[in-house]
Design a protein with these regions (language model features):
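A conserved structural motif in NAD(P)-dependent oxidoreductases
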Residues: 132-143
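Alpha-helical segment proximal to the catalytic Tyr-Lys
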Residues: 52, 94-99
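Short, small/polar-rich loop/turn modules that mediate ligand/substrate recognition or access, typified
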Residues: 13, 98-102, 158-159
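Active-site loop immediately N-terminal to the catalytic Tyr-X3-Lys motif
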Residues: 25, 71-77, 135
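Substrate-binding pocket helix/loop in short-chain dehydrogenase/reductase
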Residues: 23-24, 31-36, 116-117, 124, ...
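Short C-terminal tail/terminal secondary-structure segment
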Residues: 71, 148, 152-172
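Active-site helix of classical SDR
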Residues: 47, 82, 90
Length: 172
């Protein structure tokens, strides 16, 4: 529909995600299907559907992954696996779609906290922030700026992941 309406497709940002705890011993198939479905399956098939128009426009794809793709979070087994798979998908698509389409990822750190998850109470949040080199949480605009950079100002970058986490990934 986008191509029909605007005549072209320049970018795809795969940002949809499910996020909830899946401690080992409590994981159900429905958890797997939900987390892998939103974090890997949907980006794969959206990217595949967009590949033709993106090749024509020499566009770009940005996947929003997570720093916990590289450093798994305790009790979030399936989420961490799904984000690691999305990082792998980013690299695979970069190879498959080059040289016409660039594919990269942005990995947020502490930006928005889940409201309904007691894992991230105020004490936990402050502990995480205290272990973040920049000593603050990020803003959604920090992610948006990184995505925009990869879409508009990074013509020689593909297959890469930019951590936007205040340095947290070097401290955990």
């Amino acid at each position: 529909q986008t191509v029909m309406r605007f005549g072209r497709l320049d970018a795809l940002v795969n940002n949809a995600s499910s996020f909830f705890a899946t401690p080992l011993g409590e994981i159900q198939l429905s958890h797997w299907d939900d987390l892998v479905g939103t974090n890997v399956r949907a980006p794969l098939f959206l990217s595949q559907a967009a590949a033709g128009p993106l090749r024509k426009s020499e566009g770009a794809i940005v996947n929003v992954t997570d720093i916990h793709a590289e450093r798994p979070m305790r009790n979030y087994v399936v989420y961490s696996i799904a984000k690691a798979a999305l990082t792998g998908l980013t690299r695979s698509l970069a190879r498959e779609l080059a040289p016409d389409v660039r594919v990269n990822a942005v990995a947020p750190g502490p930006i928005l906290w889940p409201e309904d998850d007691e894992t991230f109470d105020e004490v936990s949040r402050q502990r995480i922030i205290s272990h973040t080199p920049l000593k603050r949480e990020g803003e959604p605009d920090d992610i948006a700026r990184a995505v925009r950079f990869l879409l508009e100002d990074a013509p020689y970058v593909t297959g890469e992941t930019i951590n936007v986490d205040g340095g947290r990934s070097i401290a955990i």
